[in-house]
Design a protein with these regions (language model features):
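Secondary-structure end/capping motifs
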Residues: 246-328
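Pocket-lining segment of extracytoplasmic ligand-binding domains
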Residues: 187-280
Length: 351
């Protein structure tokens, strides 16, 4: 064997020995990391930044091991945090406002979105009848909502109901004339495709599934930021007990930064973020067909902020929406939108 070959082979052997020697050390370091539990309200793509952070192991890179579960709704997600069975809840900001009104101890430390991510979908034949597309003037699309029959929603008072009332009011319509059918989230796509309801609004991919099937048409993808009152708006947020984050500042910072880094990737390297999201268990090819994933990604991407910090202006919009939705019934209980009560940037920091 030539000397050069021997040197090359020796280098390979040395590299392998080093790798094997370091493997137990890496495992030990991971074992020493604090473990945190994060519950999400649901498993849709409004939480795309969190899924990418999980897929690319950003939590481990920030120094924590994250166990992520789906709670099956915003209320059980928040209750799990309040009851200390999980450390963090990823859910909607208007839900945190409701928690405040009810006296539950929660604070937002990071924002996954900068706009509501709901997609308002109507039956395709109605979109054709009204001669509407996503390029039609927004006001024309809003006015069509007043002409609908039964509208599907997850439950009474949920954001999937309140968004229709808000948008109809915005266009000058009478929200009291809207008729809602409460079916739960998983049943809504099939209900529209079988003509049980004329419309519904959920975050991707629920509405996009109906469009890919040729039965529905998304006339208002709110994630694109067409409605000013619902843009620059912290929608899905990371919340925790105030006492927990104060007692575990490094952990809170690690989790908030991991999700924010994943969100930043959608802007700095969108194809890398897209590939990671496509590989995740909730949105891989076995779960979502290509057309549904592409529609969903295009809707969600613009709603993901460059970083997860929040502002008082954004929280004013959340509080205004919550007030209009009837979440805040007593004017004396309207919370401040300033940092320190409902939210804080002290953990998420800056890029």
């Amino acid at each position: 064997m030539k000397k050069g070959h021997k040197t090359h082979l020796g280098a390979i052997i040395l590299a392998l020995l080093t790798l094997f020697a370091l493997a137990p050390q890496v495992k030990a370091q991971q074992k020493d990391m604090p473990e945190v539990t994060i519950a999400t309200a649901v498993s849709n793509l409004a939480f795309a930044a969190l899924w990418v952070a999980e897929q690319l192991k950003y939590f481990e890179q920030e120094g924590v091991r994250a166990k992520i579960t789906v709670a099956g709704g915003g209320s059980p997600c928040q209750s799990a945090v309040v009851g200390r069975s999980v450390n963090f809840c990823a859910s909607s900001s208007e839900g945190l406002v409701l928690a405040y009104v009810e006296g539950a101890p929660l604070v937002a430390i990071q924002s996954h979105n900068r706009a509501l991510t709901l997609s308002v979908v109507i039956r395709k034949e109605l979109a054709d009848k009204f001669k509407l597309t996503r390029k039609s003037p927004l006001n024309a699309r809003l006015k069509a909502l007043s002409q609908l029959g039964p509208i599907g929603a997850t439950s009474p008072g949920a954001v999937s109901e309140q968004i229709f009332k808000f948008l109809v009011t915005k266009s000058g319509g009478d929200p009291s004339k809207l008729k809602f059918v409460y079916l739960g989230g998983p049943q809504l796509p099939a209900s529209l495709m079988n003509n049980v309801v004329d419309a519904f609004a959920l975050s991707p991919p629920s509405a996009e599934i109906t469009e890919a099937a040729g039965k529905g048409y998304v006339i208002i993808p709110l994630g694109l930021g067409e409605v000013p009152e619902l843009t620059d708006y912290p929608y899905e947020i990371l919340m925790a007990r105030p006492d927990y984050v104060e007692d575990n500042r490094k952990v809170a910072t690690a989790v908030a930064r991991a999700i924010s880094r994943a969100g930043a990737l959608f802007h700095s390297k969108p194809e890398a973020a897209k590939a990671a999201l496509r590989a995740h268990r909730f949105s891989n090819p076995k779960t979502l067909e290509d057309k549904v994933f592409e529609l969903s990604f295009d809707t969600v991407k613009p709603a993901i902020p460059r970083w997860g910090n929040m502002s008082s202006e954004g929280w004013k919009k959340v509080i205004n929406f919550a007030g209009g939705a009837g979440i805040i019934k007593d004017p004396a209980k309207v919370p401040s939108a300033e940092e320190g009560l409902l939210w804080t940037n002290k953990f998420v920091g800056k890029p």
